[in-house]
Amino acid sequence: MAPPRGKGPKRHAKGSRAPVKRKNGFATSRLDEVDSDASSAADEFPTGDLSENEMDHEEAGDDASDSEEEDLNAGQSYNELLQLLQATDSKGPARKKRKVEHKEEKVKKLKTDAVVEGAEEEEKEEEEEAVANDLEQQEPSDEEDANLDEANADEQDSDTEDGTDPFESHFANPKEADLTKKIQAVEAKKWTTAKKETEGLRLVRSVPEGAEASFLPTMKSLANVKLKRKLQTTAKDAIPSISGHAQHLAPYVFDYQDVLYGARTTSNAVPMRDILAAHATNHVLKTRDRVLKNNLRAAKEQDADLDLRDQGFTRPKVLYLLPSKQACVRVVESITRLFQPEQQENKKRFLDTFSAEDDVSWDNKPDDFRELFAGNNDDMFRLGLKFTRKTIKFFAQFYTSDMILASPLGLRTIMDQADAKKRDHDFLSSIEVVIVDHADALQMQNWDHVDYILKHLNLQPKEAHGCDFSRVRPWYLDNQARHVRQLIMLAGFITPEINSVYSAQMQNVAGKVKATPVYEGAISELPLPVSVKQTFSRFDSLSPAKDPDARFKHFTTTVLSTLVRQITAGRGKHRGGVLIVIPSYLDFVRVRNHFATSAQTANLSFGAISEYTEPREVARARSHFMNGRHSVLLYSERFHHFRRYQIRGVRQVVMYGVPENPRFYGEMVGFLGLDAAAVVEAAEGGVRALFSKWDALKLERVVGTKRLGNMMRERGGDTFTFV
């Protein structure tokens, strides 16, 4: 059974998934790859394996009106005509030329008809065939690359091996004794930790016991980064300088340390994306260059006893986890801008299926919403990229790819198929750099997919996949790859689930660093013309597991009883307009059922909007709440994440729990000011939010870092009011 999307409502208009296209064997040569952006048969119908070519050609031939023999004769005639055209003098008779051209056009038409018919068949293929194509196990074509490398030896951007290069010290030639000692410390959970605060950013660095947990100097540019020669000029142009939070994080990124960054914004996302693209591309090129050099060396010194440990079990080395196809397009654009390939195979197909225009109706939406959902926001995708010296190939099979870019759902679907025999995650066995961007958005989709993927990284493969074990690095064979792998995660804010990744999955012997901002608090940045009373009520909760029950009890006995009295007593004065915001969907269902069945709320009219509510019901609930027919509206945080509607008619906001995203707090409190004539009255209703000691992370983002300490030290039942 395929894993659930778990992403709330149906996606926006641009987010529909394009039909899966099967590889077609019509165009088998590389002649059309010279101009990747030109419209060609090779772009629209990517090349496949020989067996697929023959099968597809036979299918097209069955549908054509001519027989197989006639097709063969037509093909022979076409070749003869080409030879004739080459041999014919340009000054020959015009009548003869017209006859040749007519025959040539006729043969071309036959082939074009076959392509069109093949395209119609491709559109009918199901997702299972796309999965099979992605996982098609081909032997890595290193021989082809090696021949190309040898033929272009003069142009090879060969770099001398530098012992100070983190790639050398961390991956290629680590000191065995030091590596063993650090792995033992990591497995024993013995870390040395240091902390510091700088420029509104709190840094926590941890290294295995025995190493010094000092902080690296800031990085203002890429001048001292050990980049491949091919990337040095382009990287300097794309990233002329490094500033802001990036200058504190870049040293750890290029040093192959694990990084958790919890202050991602729309403004700093672009420079961080370029830095990570440079790092990922640099790692791929260095890895491939080392393999190709050793291939040539092994071929020249066949009698020598060489110990060439330069590989993992499988070829893919970099994994990107991204929230949408458009996010994937942005990453690929950064990579191609740095790599500047002479050819980009299947680029047109990539843009056609992954990119889309922005929805102009979203101009009034917040910038973070537009960044996440603009363009093609489909969250079901996966893409393999293969690098050669001058080419990037899109839609490469995973086992011949150097880099995999995917959504958690798209990758989980291929790893966790209904048929146990088809499940496969061996292509993740040798991943050395993992980049998870916009992790907070991934959590709103389905965090279980992210967790599943991370737990299946760097496991021992079930099959050999053509691996030359004599060239596998020792720490792969010892099942220690997870301690050398680098994991980089960027998020707009830190949640307990993201913190769990830092604790459980970031086990790098080079160390790890976590960066979180110092928060001023969303309560001080409300979009209202008047001050509003904001009350935070703390309740006792013994454990995270018991927190939902304690929260529900406190809400029904303390908060809801007061609301019922206020609304009932003020019915003649048109009281109501109570918006109850509920972060968790499970809590939402529980509260909704209580409103529907409890005698306590029998006299209240209410509406409910969640991420699973049908659009027609959403419109009806909003309308009834705005005109007063519903005095209470239950509203889920995930719905707000996916839609960002402005709810009118709000006179009081009650937060069943503090929202994870601090921006949502300000936006929802801002609903009080949508009606300018009633803004003063709405401000009197104010805001009331419930919290427990387990809400410390999200409470800090709302009330601010300085206020958090006192609120966490007080006992349950205490109330904190801010104006």
From Swiss-Prot:
The gene name on file is: utp25
The keyword Nucleotide-binding belongs to this UniProt entry's keyword annotation: no
Q: Name one Pfam family in it.
A: UTP25_NTPase-like
What is the native source organism of this protein?
Aspergillus terreus (strain NIH 2624 / FGSC A1156)
Ranges of biased composition (kind: Basic residues): 7-24
Query: What are the transmembrane regions?
Result: none
Composition-biased stretches, type Basic and acidic residues, lie in: 101-114
Q: Does the keyword Ribonucleoprotein apply?
A: yes
Similarity remark: Belongs to the UTP25 family.
Q: What does this protein do?
A: DEAD-box RNA helicase-like protein required for pre-18S rRNA processing, specifically at sites A0, A1, and A2.
Q: Which molecular-function annotations from GO does this UniProt entry contain?
A: rRNA binding; U3 snoRNA binding
Q: What is its main location?
A: nucleus
Question: Protein name, please?
Answer: U3 small nucleolar RNA-associated protein 25
UniProt subcellular location: Nucleus, Nucleolus
Which region ranges are annotated with the description Disordered?
1-179
